[in-house]
C-alpha cells in the first residue's frame, strides 16, 4: 500500500503531525505485564487506554492504570457497563481509578460478552453522577461508524442523541471514541449522519496501527465490521499479501485531508488499536513524528 505516497503540501504535513502529536494507544493489562514498563516504548505525549475485557480481573486493570500513571502517562481506563456486576462494584472501580490511580479521564463503553449484572448501558453509568463525584474531567463514550452487529441502527442513533443531551448538563468534557475502521470514507459518511442527529461531541477516530492484513481481517471479522471486512478482503485476493504489514499511512493522510477540507468537522484526535503489537505501533509513531524521515512510504518532504 501507498509505497509511493508523499506528503508535500505544508498544510497536510502540519495536520498529520497535529493528529499524531496527541494521539492515544490502547493496551491490555496482560500486554503491559509482558513489558513491565512502557517508558522505553511509548512516548509520554501519548494517552494510553487500558482495556477491561469481559474476562478481565478488575484489580489488574486498576493496577495497570496506577503503574502507567506513575510512569507519567495520561491514562484512560475502560469502564464496561455490562461487565460491572452492580452499582457497588461500579463505585469501587471508579473510586479506585480516581483516588488510588489519579485518573481524571475514562472511556465508558457498553462492553462485550454476556451481561454480568444489572447495568445495561453506558448512559446508565453516566446518569449515576459517580464520574462527577470523583472529579473526572474528560469522558469518552464508545461509538460505531460502521454499525454494530449486536445493536440496531435506531438504538445506536438514540445512544448518540442521549449522550449529546447528557453532555449539556455534565461538568466534564465528553467525546465520541470510535470503533476502528480502515477507510476515511467510513468516517466521512458517518459524520454526515451524525450531523443529522445534531451531534456536538468531538470525535476521536479509532484506527489500527501497523499489522498484517491477515491480523486486521481477523479483528474486523470478530467485531462484525461489514464495510471494513469487504475493503480488506479485496486486498487479500492476492494471498501473498496476507503476511504483508499494512501501516496506516494512507488512512492518516486521508483523515488529515478531510480535516483540512472540512473545517467544521468534529474529528479532533486519532486513537490507535495496536493489533500488530504496541511496540510496532509505537515505533511507527516515533518515526513519522520526525519530519525528515519516512516510514513504510509515509514521507514528509
Question: Where are the language model's segments positioned?
Answer:
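Short, small-residue-biased leader/transition segments that mark boundaries at the very start
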Residues: 1-7
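Glycine- and other small-residue-rich loops at beta-strand/loop junctions that grip anionic moieties
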Residues: 53, 82, 179-180, 208, ...
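Active-site glycine- and acidic-residue-rich loops that bind
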Residues: 85-88, 114-121, 152, 178-193, ...
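Conserved, mostly hydrophobic/aromatic
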Residues: 77, 163-164, 172, 205, ...
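Short, surface-exposed basic-aromatic patches at helix termini and helix-loop junctions that form
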Residues: 67-70, 94-99, 191-200, 286-293
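Active-site pocket-lining/capping segments in soluble small-molecule metabolic enzymes
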Residues: 25-31, 109, 122-146, 161, ...
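Extended serine/threonine-enriched, polar tracts that run as long, contiguous segments within proteins
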Residues: 25-28, 175-179
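Active-site beta->alpha loop and helix N-cap motifs at the rims of alpha/beta catalytic domains
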Residues: 8-166
Amino acid at each position: 500500500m501507498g509505497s509511493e505516497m508523499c506528503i508535500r503540501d505544508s498544510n497536510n504535513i502540519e495536520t498529520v503531525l497535529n493528529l499524531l502529536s496527541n494521539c492515544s494507544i490502547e493496551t491490555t493489562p496482560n500486554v503491559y505485564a509482558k513489558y513491565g514498563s512502557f517508558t522505553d516504548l511509548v512516548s509520554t505525549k501519548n494517552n494510553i487506554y487500558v482495556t477491561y475485557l469481559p474476562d478481565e480481573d478488575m484489580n489488574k486493570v486498576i493496577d495497570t492504570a496506577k503503574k502507567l500513571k506513575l510512569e507519567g502517562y495520561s491514562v484512560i481506563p475502560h469502564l464496561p457497563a455490562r461487565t460491572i456486576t452492580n452499582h457497588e462494584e461500579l463505585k469501587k472501580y471508579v473510586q479506585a481509578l480516581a483516588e488510588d490511580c489519579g485518573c481524571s479521564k475514562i472511556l465508558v463503553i457498553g462492553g462485550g460478552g454476556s451481561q454480568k449484572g444489572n447495568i445495561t448501558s453506558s448512559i446508565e453509568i453516566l446518569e449515576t453522577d459517580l464520574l462527577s463525584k470523583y472529579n473526572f474531567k474528560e469522558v469518552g463514550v464508545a461509538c460505531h461508524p460502521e454499525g454494530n452487529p449486536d445493536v440496531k441502527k435506531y438504538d445506536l442513533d438514540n445512544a448518540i442523541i442521549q449522550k449529546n443531551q447528557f453532555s449539556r448538563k455534565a461538568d466534564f468534557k465528553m467525546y465520541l471514541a470510535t470503533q476502528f475502521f480502515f477507510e476515511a470514507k467510513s468516517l466521512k459518511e458517518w459524520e454526515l449522519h451524525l450531523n443529522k442527529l445534531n451531534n456536538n461531541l468531538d470525535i476521536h477516530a479509532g484506527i489500527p496501527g501497523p499489522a498484517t492484513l491477515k491480523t486486521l481481517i481477523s479483528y474486523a471479522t470478530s467485531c462484525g465490521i461489514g464495510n471494513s471486512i469487504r475493503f480488506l478482503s479485496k486486498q487479500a485476493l492476492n494471498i501473498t499479501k496476507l503476511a504483508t504489514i499494512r501501516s496506516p499511512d494512507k488512512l492518516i493522510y486521508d483523515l488529515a485531508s478531510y480535516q483540512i477540507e472540512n473545517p467544521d468537522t468534529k474529528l479532533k484526535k486519532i486513537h490507535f488499536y495496536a493489533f500488530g503489537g504496541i511496540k510496532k505501533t509505537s515505533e511507527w509513531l516515533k518515526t513519522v513524528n520526525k519530519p525528515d524521515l519516512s516510514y513504510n512510504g509515509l514521507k514528509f518532504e
